[in-house]
Structure formats: structure tokens, C-alpha cells
Amino acid sequence: MSSLPLIVLTALLAQSSAPAPDYAFFKERVQPIFLKKRPGHARCLTCHDHGSPPLQPLSPGAATWDEEQSRKNFAVWKQFIKPGDPLKSPLLRHPLAEEAGGDRFHAGGKHFKSQSDPEWQTLAAWVNGEKLDPKTNGGTQ
């Protein structure tokens, strides 16, 4: 008897147990990271409003994205994560210093020196399926 069906079933179960990325968490916690200016670096939006992967350009005079733009950003950026596995997610590896587990890719430089950086931790929380707690109006569950 072949063990192939068991291997396929195990792989499917592992995929189905991965947490789904949460839109509300993305909108309230992840998107502000894309807008934040960091010393020595441009904001993510500066390159990614016309780069790959893209962020929606801000509307004239807007400080953040509207609902439609946020949903488009979510649809694009969730493709650059591996739910449940931050270190296999390009969104987290590319801007992370190589000595901290990042890779050499990211023309925009290394925004995070370590995995303990609070913003890197926020991105990791999203990849790990963290959700906002509606009872605390934006707290996490």
C-alpha cells in the first residue's frame, strides 16, 4: 500500500489548520506600518505605490486608505504571507536584517533589525492569525 495518500492528507490538514489573515487586523494594525516613516528609510508606500507588490496610492489629501483601497491592499498583501509561518512570509523576511532571519531581497533596505521589533511583531501577529477584539474596540484576541 502506498503512503502517498497519507502524505497528501497530512499536507492538506496542515494547510487547513493555518490561521486565515484577518482583514480588520490588517486595516487597523498592519497598514499604519506601511505609512510610517523610519529613520534612514522611506515609507513603504513611497516605493510600493508603484512597485511590486503594490499598495494603493493614497487619495489626494488623505492620511490613510479608504475602505475600498484597504480591501485591495489586503487582497494583494495576503499573497505575500504564509499563514501561521512568519519566517516563510516574504512580507516579514524581505525587510528583516539577514542576521535576524531575513533574506537579501528588498530594494527598500532592512527596516527591522530583529524579530523583536514591535512593528515586525505586529506583522507576525497578523500572519499568525491574530484578530482584533471587537469588545475592546481594536484590542487583540
Report residues per predicted region.
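Sec-dependent signal peptide recognition
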Residues: M1-L9
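Aromatic- and Gly/Pro-enriched helix-to-coil junctions and flexible linker segments
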Residues: L13-Q141
